[in-house]
Structure formats: C-alpha cells, structure tokens
UniProtKB/Swiss-Prot annotation:
Protein name: Transcription initiation factor IIB 2
One cellular component (GO) term of this entry: transcription preinitiation complex
Lineage: Archaea, Methanobacteriati, Methanobacteriota, Stenosarchaea group, Halobacteria
Entry-linked Pfam families: TFIIB, Zn_Ribbon_TF
Organism of provenance: Haloferax volcanii (strain ATCC 29605 / DSM 3757 / JCM 8879 / NBRC 14742 / NCIMB 2012 / VKM B-1768 / DS2) (Halobacterium volcanii)
Induction of the gene: By heat shock (60 degrees Celsius), with a 2-fold increase (at protein level).
Keyword Cytoplasm: no
Positions of the UniProt region annotated as Disordered: 1-36, 77-106
Zinc-finger recorded as keyword: yes
Zinc finger (TFIIB-type): 33-63
Amino acid sequence: MSDTITTRTYSADAKSRDVRPRESERDETQQDETQVCPECSGHLVTDEEHGETICEDCGLVVEDTVVDRGPEWRAFDSAERDSKSRVGAPTTKMMHDKGLSTNIGWQNKDAYGKSLSPRQREQMQRLRTWNERFRTRDSKERNLKQALGEIDRMASALGLPENVRETASVIYRRALNDDLLPGRSIEGVATSALYASARMAGTPRSLDELEKVSRVDKMELTRTYRYIVRELKLEIKPADPEQYVPRFASELGLSDEAERQARQLLRDAKETGIHSGKSPVGLAAAAVYAAALLTNEKVTQSEVSTVADISEVTIRNRYKELLEVQDGTLLA
C-alpha cells in the first residue's frame, strides 16, 4: 500500500513539474502577443499623453484606457519637483530619528504667511519645546542626536560627501548599540567614526585635519579610533597617498597633467618601497610639489604646506626621495 502511495505522489510531483514550464511558456507567448498588433503583427507603442496603445504600422488603437501611474503635475527641475511632491524625504541614518518625526518650523507665520499674534507665538514656542522633548525621549536618543550633529558639522567643514556622513552615522550607531561609549566622549567616538568612514570611502582626511574641526585632541582621537576599529572589526586598508592627490591638486589649481605626474611619482615610489613607514599625506604633498615643478607650474612649498597641513621640512625630505626614485627610473 505504501509503495502505491509513494508512486502516486511522485507522479503528481512530476506532473506539476511538467505543467509549470508549460504555464510559463504560455505566459511568455501571451506577453509576446500583446506586444504586437493583432491585425498586422506590427510594433505597438504607448501614447502616455492620450492613454492609448497604438500600432505603428497600421494605426490600430489596441487599447484606449491605459492608466498613467505617474504624478498629474509636471516639473522642469529638481527644485520644482521637490516643491510639488507630496511625499516625505527618504529615511536616513544621519538623523537620530531617521527623519521620521515631525519638525515644527521656526517661522512665526500661519498658512497664509501672516505673522502670529504674541499669544500664538508663545503657544508655538511651547509646542516646539514639547515636540523637541518627544523627539528625544531618553538619554540614548539625546546621545545619538548630539553625535550625529557633530558628524554633520565636521563633515561639512571638511567638505566630505553625503555617503561618508551616512557611513559615519552607521558606525556610530553600531558603537552605541554595542555599548562601546562608556569611558569615552561622544565627540571622540563621533570623530573616530568620521575618520574611519572617510578612509573606507577613499576620501581620507589626515588626523591633523580632523583635530582642527573636532573638540578632541589628536591623542584621544587616535586611541578612540583604534578601539572602535578593533571592537567593530572594521576592514580599513592602509591609507593610499594617491587618494590625497586629487584634493591637493584641485586646491592648488594644478593641471590634469600635473596630477597624472604626481600619481606616477607615487606609483614609482611604491615599486621601490620607499613609501613604507612614511606619512601618506607627506608623500602626496611632496609628489604634488614635484609634479608641479616637472610641469613648469608655479607652486611654492609654503602653499603646498598650507593645503596639506604639514611642515615644509617634511615636503622637502619626501621631495628629494621621490626625485631620487624618478632619476633611478629614468636611468633604468
């Protein structure tokens, strides 16, 4: 009896497997048929303005009730599109509430643009106060709000793109959820998260640059950064001097040829191994300075020092080493 049941089950499964391909083939055939004209087998096009599907060859109107699922309004630029859109912005990790809460504007005006009376202004101020309290209900949310504000402020000062800010916010959230903050300052962890994020995105900034815009010193930043990377197991490659070249060249107003020359100098230095143990910022600055001289562009060591935020002595030392490598490459 059991053998008979098993056989029947197998047959049913086999039958279902045979049916599914046939059904999919039938669906594909029907889909292909709907894309051609039933009269002349010509190509069909959709006229979205009139809501019709017509044949290009014979002009037959195949369907005249096509639904336009787009907005009923038109916009000619991004600003106009944003102003007419009736949906909110996408959620973001850069805000402590991910942008889902309501924010009461600071303008004391009604919907018609008229100024509020003194009594109404007092009421609105109380509403703003209570709204702010509800947005940060506990210490964890207040911590997150302060940290993400710091990340946004520092990223703006350093000219870092939005994707770096988003990644830094995610890193800080992970540190907060893993309870890594006790014994460390909010500013220190936030700065470390931004430093790590910038390196991961290939747009690194030096520790000296982070120290200038942060409220923590370089020693605390270094210590906290190593702790965060170790505990969160972040995969961060050593900083590449070439990643600093585009920014330095842009701020100094150098040509594309000078930038290419600087990259080539750094590649030659890597092949010889002289970059090992040296600051990537110093090497990049020296390469940019050397490339400017090789392409006959006027740049002083002082200008490069200001842009790269390193001493002129470091630039001179690395510059000599790069030229030695360049001379050896040309002789070879």
